[in-house]
Amino acid sequence: MKIGSGFLSGGGGPSSSGGSGSGGSSGSASGGSGGGRRAEMEPTFPQSMVMFNHRLPPVTSFTRPAGTAAPPPQCVLSSSTSAAPAAEPPPPPAPDMTFKKEPAASAAAFPSQRTSWGFLQSLVSIKQEKPADPEEQPSHHHHHHHHYGGLFAGAEERSPGLGGGEGGSHGVIQDLSLLHQHAQQQPAQHHRDVLLSSGSRTDEHGNQEPKQDANVKKAKRPKPESQGIKAKRKPSASSKPLVGEGEGAVLSPSQKPHICDHCSAAFRSSYHLRRHVLIHTGERPFQCSQCSMGFIQKYLLQRHEKIHSREKPFGCDQCSMKFIQKYHMERHKRTHSGEKPYKCDTCQQYFSRTDRLLKHRRTCGEAIAKGAASAEPGSSNHNSMGNLAVLSQGNTSSSRRKSKSKSIAIENKEHKTGKTNESQMSNNINMQSYSVEMPTVSTSGSIIGTGIDELQKRVPKLIFKKGSRKNADKSYLNFVSPLPDVVGQKSLSGKPGGSLGIVSNNSVETISLLQSTSGKQGPISSNYDDAMQFSKKRRYLPTASSNSAFSINVGHMVSQQSVIQSAGVSVLDNEAPLSLIDSSALNAEIKSCHDKSGIPDEVLQSILDQYSGKSETQKEDPFNLTEPRVDLHTSGEHSELVQEENLSPGTQTPSNDKTSMLQEYSKYLQQAFEKSTNAGFTLGHGFQFVSLSSPLHNHTLFPEKQIYTTSPLECGFGQSVTSVLPSSLPKPPFGMLFGSQPGLYLSALDATHQQLTPSQELDDLIDSQKNLETSSAFQSSSQKLTSQKEQQKNLESSTSFQIPSQELASQIDPQKDIEPRTTYQIENFAQAFGSQFKSGSRVPMTFITNSNGEVDHRVRTSVSDFSGYTNMMSDVSEPCSTRVKTPTSQSYR
């Protein structure tokens, strides 16, 4: 018997190559040569029906009934068998073969399927019964042999469609070349059929088959004992063996013929499959007696029980750590040795743990291969697997089965990832997971297939796109410039199909930095490390959804838009963009979330570090203390502070970055004041406050006996929540000015100060407030300040901070010609840094100058007005719990 070449070349359909004898429809052209006329394969017969149960050796003889007669019961092929020309008598069919068609699937429904799923479905729909006549076994033995050895053992004659001619000496090479061609044209399941049927040929002049082949096959037949044992074992409902028993004996022991219906995992035996199915069914036969946990295997339960018994038999010989499992100990030892035995084949990275390698592979190698395969569904994956099956001459069936199971598993994973949209991007931003539904397969597929390496090399770590908010989405597409625009548009739509792994999946950690100047977004930083630090610190900062002018977009997803917007610093001079700083996020946090108790220390410290390089060369010009109040112009559109009323045009103006800082803080102060429902601290008459760029690195703790001098009064603010990190800030970024009229000035001279943590300040503040709770008017005595001074002396040796009095002039320029009648209210800082102040309670704060040059501060308030953070003015000289002793007795009124 012989299978016609139409099955090979046509792939179960019409003849692909045409010509005489090349397709299933050309049997009459080649059938006039004698009694050995070939029975040709029915063109509509489904390719994947060449499957065998383990009770029967494989059969490769599928014949067409003669004339218009009904199919004989020995070969019932349902509707797929049609009448052949009457002039073509078929060879005698296998009398022992009966195909039972299950009603679940129709054989005619599968011919066009080209995926491995069709392979499985058609496999489910066919059952074969055991042969009744043992006399037919030798011929089947020979056919069976050709399934495995026909390619390489001696294929006699190839049909003209195979291009083989009459000579059998070219058979192996011709078959291999043919299979290479078909590997590029047909899906994976064809390779199995091609390989199975390619060698089973009889010569043109008869049906006699070489006896040595039959002898070889008999030598390869399994022992009847093993066959009987396996025949007794009932296959699981989930088990659909891919091979027969006879084939299984020939194949290598590493084969996994048992496939799980749930996840397409392959197993060597039905026991392993049944044990695996428990994972899907949720059954846990082994229950722990001490907790509610259950396990599918006994050894897992025994290992778990060691947790309850606290038994850790495996200890590290280099440290004191012990482990329940030996594997955990060995894995731990690699942390001492630095060994990284696990290598990613795609990017050549090494890993010390398999779980890290697997996590990396999800974003690296297999994802890229999967993307390339899905770009060209018919050729890429199956082509590689087909060539693999052909070239592995040692165990072709094993390689075929492995490749099939891999293709099933990979395809299943593709479906899952397509549904859940879960993919991650590694730090080096590898391209990943091109969609199954990629539009314009021919163009985009070729681009993806050929240029992935180049694409990876060209992909930048960060893309900065200038433009308005509506263009923010398009900036993400710059990651995939080699791809056509259709890909980008589809991925922007957020569909699970047309997704680039970078664009349309939830957990992408791309950070797109978009800074807006006057409402427009532009680049703010090219420093990737700063961006990552900011993304770590954003856990402190809830999302500020509405910020008018400045935003830093930390995008997790285009569709998700997990954006942290913050009042960024406007870069007025476009020479060098500012690095990404946390002050912008801090401003947005203060502005949008007034109910937060304070700002994290890390955020404040990063602000201080950002503006630590200010000039100290500018001169002092005090403001008059007794002048009436003039509001500061804080329009968001101004690029500088308005100077016509409160700035001196004759003095040196601050640099652009300082001006932009002043502008931002002034704008924030004004907005906070307008939104404030809590009356904060109103400074006394003539007290002027200049907008803070950022809180001081520490409390401005003034050294003893030098607090009051005749220099202009400059008092830098120290915030109650200050950074615990050491800072080398040479001076306070902003200060507070007092007028020159009383002749009493406060000067911050150079001193060494130890920074105090916010918790220490808060504790001291609460303690002092509790002590003062019984009296509405209280006085912070000099005795307390003395004790605080002693503490300060002990702390003076740690960190040095210089607080020059020239700082003020670097922030604002007072007028020399006319004395501005300006005061600044600081209610907004009460709102910004401590929204816990009760609404409606105004805490007036005034500085009263005594005749002897002392400043008397009193605060008439109760502790109920405070909720944990002192007012900003308490840091002008010292807070209620200040750690500096001043030579005068001061209290707050």
Swiss-Prot record:
One of its GO terms (molecular function) is DNA-binding transcription repressor activity, RNA polymerase II-specific. Pfam families: zf-C2H2. SMART domains: ZnF_C2H2 (SM00355). GO terms for biological process: embryonic body morphogenesis; negative regulation of DNA-templated transcription; negative regulation of gene expression; positive regulation of DNA-templated transcription; stem cell differentiation. The modification Phosphoserine is found at S392, S481, S648, S782, S805. Residues 1-113, 126-148, 153-172, 198-251, 371-425, 613-658, 775-815 are annotated as: Disordered. Residues 127-139, 201-216, 616-641 have a biased composition (Basic and acidic residues). Keywords: Differentiation, DNA-binding, Isopeptide bond, Metal-binding, Nucleus, Phosphoprotein, Repeat, Repressor, Transcription, Transcription regulation, Ubl conjugation, Zinc, Zinc-finger. One of its GO terms (cellular component) is nucleus. A zinc finger (C2H2-type) spans 258-280, 286-308, 314-336, 342-364. Disruption phenotype: Embryos die between embryonic day 7.5 (E7.5) and E8.5, due to dysregulation of pluripotency and lineage specific markers in embryonic stem cells (ESCs). Embryos show abnormal embryonic body differentiation. Residues 377-396, 645-658, 775-813 have a biased composition (Polar residues). The keyword Lyase does not apply. Interacts with NANOG. Associates with the NuRD complex. Transcription repressor that plays a role in regulation of embryonic stem cells (ESCs) differentiation. Required for ESCs differentiation and acts by mediating autorepression of NANOG in ESCs: binds to the NANOG promoter and promotes association of NANOG protein to its own promoter and recruits the NuRD complex, which deacetylates histones. Not required for establishement and maintenance of ESCs. Represses the transcription of a number of genes including GAST, ODC1 and VIM. Binds to the G-rich box in the enhancer region of these genes. Belongs to the krueppel C2H2-type zinc-finger protein family. This is Zinc finger protein 281. The gene is Znf281.
